[in-house]
């Protein structure tokens, strides 16, 4: 069984605890081995956000940190067997990097990459694992991770120009031409800005944003007809929506809805 991990689907698996409210720029989720099938594989739906998954055991210091940058295509990842999996989904306002990094280090630096490593004995990451061992609740671990990110990493925000452009997209700009007209930037300059920060063009960013919003509606209202989901979203017709859905998820809307209903 494959489970989709993306901003609006992190709570699709019945055994997963989630927290999307306590932090402005992060969503948290947690699952343990008892709720997972063997040979567990997760699929990252194309997105402009980054993901960390911390895998650890109860009775030893064996652990693995997984950092997945923004993905331009559907990406599958097999998880090694651990007692617990603690995940963090960051939004598109920036990334956390190691202390001392250049403040203009953007998400593009890890785009389309998945980094996996075991924490060194005296590292900040190993101390976080030890703190997780002593924690009692999911809420405790969320607080511990937030402190870890603040104290041991550097948050590098996206540029002010990108913040402005993203805000226009959130407000309804559905094409690069509309974005250009509303921002005063040329189409070419906008594309350069998005590629510099995210490693994707503005057109692809808008596609991802549109699709994630539609996916949120599907998860919230799986019994609705497809026409309800795509109304006013920029899809030209059902065929356009079906093609993009297949590209992003590797499946059809009908199959996807059946999948989430079975969770």
Please give the residue ranges for each predicted region.
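Long, low-complexity intrinsically disordered regions
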Residues: 176, 191-196, 203-206
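Residues within well-ordered alpha-helical secondary structure of globular protein domains
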Residues: 101, 196, 217-220, 247
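A secondary-structure capping/hinge motif
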Residues: 194-200, 244-256
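Alpha-helical bundle regulatory/interaction domains
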Residues: 1-163, 168-177, 183-187, 201, ...
């Amino acid at each position: 069984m494959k489970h989709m991990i993306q901003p609006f689907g992190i709570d699709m698996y019945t055994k997963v605890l989630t927290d999307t409210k306590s932090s402005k720029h992060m969503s948290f989720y947690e699952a343990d081995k008892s709720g997972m099938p063997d040979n567990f594989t997760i699929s990252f739906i194309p997105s402009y956000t980054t993901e960390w998954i911390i895998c650890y055991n109860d009775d030893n210091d064996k652990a693995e940190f997984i950092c997945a940058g923004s993905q331009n295509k559907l990406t599958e990842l097999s998880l090694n067997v651990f007692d617990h999996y603690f995940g963090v989904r960051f939004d598109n306002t920036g990334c956390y990097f190691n202390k001392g990094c250049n403040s203009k280090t953007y998400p593009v630096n890890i785009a389309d990459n998945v980094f996996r490593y075991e924490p060194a004995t005296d590292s900040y990451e190993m101390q976080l694992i030890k703190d997780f061992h002593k924690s009692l609740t999911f809420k405790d671990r969320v607080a511990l991770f937030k402190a870890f990110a603040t104290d041991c990493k550097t948050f590098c925000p996206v540029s002010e120009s990108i913040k402005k452009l993203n805000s226009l997209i959130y407000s309804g700009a559905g094409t690069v031409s509309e974005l250009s007209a509303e921002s005063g930037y040329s189409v070419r300059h906008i594309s350069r800005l998005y590629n510099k920060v995210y490693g994707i063009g503005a057109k692809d960013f808008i596609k991802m944003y549109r699709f994630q919003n539609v996916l949120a509606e599907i998860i919230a209202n799986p019994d609705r007809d497809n026409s309800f989901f795509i109304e006013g979203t920029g899809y030209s017709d059902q065929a356009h929506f079906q093609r993009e859905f297949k590209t992003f998820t590797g499946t059809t809307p009908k199959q996807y809805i059946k999948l989430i209903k079975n969770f």
